[in-house]
């Protein structure tokens, strides 16, 4: 029995649940990419899949909209895979366990994958409909967005005719953004020399912070565990020898 069969828009959440059953964390998008390609093949839609698992699906305009400007619908196939400490799940081989909590759709003990599964679900629902009038639709599904826009960097979009892009990757209903938070990833290498440590050893762990997303909460001045650990270390005795600094799995 489907969990979301009575959630509206029904067709959108039908596809969202379909996608939730397919493991699709970053770097593991082959299965969900193949699902989208099979979807297109069953409906005889023009579709492309590259070696990186990016997918483009094209549906020609309905009657009366042949001369209208094509619309590009864009979302990403990968999700952030995080779980609660007491949850057992193999994200590479198991789908999500959805449930309804009041007005919210949630996943048991894990992230939901709404970012950006809902975008793919919207696009598939529109592509599947015979009742929605539309210009030529060009649906672009990229991979590994959560780890650095890797799919977007590699994708070939030479088959597209549209110039108007709707990127479906925001979290506020009814709000349209014409901006981007941006992001920078720095990889640094330093020459290190390891010696046997003497004296007492201590583990310092900082947890329980509110957290947040730099795209939406960067101005809230919330504590960042990495920054705060750095401040603590800066004020400790200079004779302290550091062994290792680590952080959680999410950036």
Q: Which sequence ranges carry the predicted segments?
A:
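Conserved beta-strand termini and adjacent loop/short-helix elements that scaffold enzyme active sites
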Residues: 50-52, 142, 245
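Midchain, well-structured core segments that form catalytic/ion-binding scaffolds
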Residues: 23, 95-97, 101-106, 110, ...
